[in-house]
Amino acid sequence: MTDDFEDSFPDNETDAFEQAPLRLTVDLGALADNWRDMKKRSGRARTAAVVKADAYGLGIEDCGATLYHAGARDFFVATVAEGATLRSYAPEARIFVLSGIWQGQERQVFDNDLVPVLASEEQLSFWMATVAERGDHPCALHVDTGFNRLGLPLDDALFLADDVTRPASFDPVLVLSHLACADTPSSPMNRAQLESFRRVSAAFEGIESSLSASAGIFLGPDYHFDLTRPGIALYGGEAVNDVANPMRPVAKAEARIIQIREAGEGQTVSYGSSFLLKRASRLAIASVGYADGYQRSLSGSGIPLREMGHGGAYGVVNGHKVPVAGRVTMDLTIFDVTDVPANAIRAGDYIELFGPNVPVDETARAAGTIGYEMLTGLGLRYERQYLVADD
């Protein structure tokens, strides 16, 4: 009886991706192409890959392996734990840890051959004592040139460069800084930071220099130095404001339609009854909500961002653009599908939340945020599919 019962189900019900309430497709071929594009734009500089925050939410294992296979030999992560995970997928790469090192992490750093990026006097002192005891191991130095986040003060870095008393086991292989306004090419801050970093680069003669992340690469060769550090551009996001995005989309998020329902003119939709229907409508209830990173600020009405004049978000289903109706809830979002022909949509279809037809940065703008946050904020309920990159 059990065998007959199991045999009565169609084969596709065993395919987790095809039947998932939420799906995330990651195009590894597009990821590799985007890295090659950044490499070409970087000119003579080597091109690293930033894979922090689980490769911007898309999976450090698959993305890291793809980028390594594409040719990346320098990687940047945020934490020692991320670096340890990446090491298996990038066996001969240099892996820089942007948050540096804390006491107790020495073994992980040495065992996984990670390069801590030192950004404070405390980290410098601890690292010098560590290598004096354990022996030579490469490190990097982060110098603040105006961002006022992480980094050694400029004068301290210049003093360190000339400090003949520093131990021989102290072996910086890279000095880096980070631009505050690279996404706005006209900002005078870019040139000011460039001039400061040129002083740092000259002071640490013989040590590689790195200033540019994704947006900085687009500022041109003056900003490239020895190594560039693309991040968001690899994953298809916009790096520069107010210009066409040349990168290939990498991620596509989709939510399954649970139900399609009719609603009359004058009725309201979702919490707060703030979304008033001005005509008889058809509504599709999709299995995605703010628990999945589809933020409440993407709501069609009834929240402060909407009242400030931002347009609501939309999805695409079977080639048709459909706006969000009413407030996004924890697990569900309602889309107005009135203008989709009845024979072109049904329960079980998928609405593209962002992807090739709905740029992730456009969705982010509707939420009052940026593509970085949309990608890194994806929840745990997406069934993932990785499209393998061609050689």
From Swiss-Prot:
GO terms for molecular function: alanine racemase activity; pyridoxal phosphate binding. InterPro entries: Ala_racemase, Ala_racemase/Decarboxylase_C, Ala_racemase_C, Ala_racemase_N, Ala_racemase_pyridoxalP-BS, PLP-binding_barrel. PROSITE patterns: ALANINE_RACEMASE (PS00395). It catalyses: L-alanine = D-alanine. GO terms for cellular component: cytosol. The active site is at 52 (proton acceptor), 271 (proton acceptor). Keywords: Cell shape, Cell wall biogenesis/degradation, Isomerase, Peptidoglycan synthesis, Pyridoxal phosphate. Pfam families: Ala_racemase_C (PF00842), Ala_racemase_N (PF01168). The modification N6-(pyridoxal phosphate)lysine is found at residue 52. One of its GO terms (biological process) is D-alanine biosynthetic process. Its cofactor is pyridoxal 5'-phosphate. Substrate binds at residues 149, 330. Catalyzes the interconversion of L-alanine and D-alanine. Provides the D-alanine required for cell wall biosynthesis. This is Alanine racemase, biosynthetic. It comes from Agrobacterium fabrum (strain C58 / ATCC 33970).
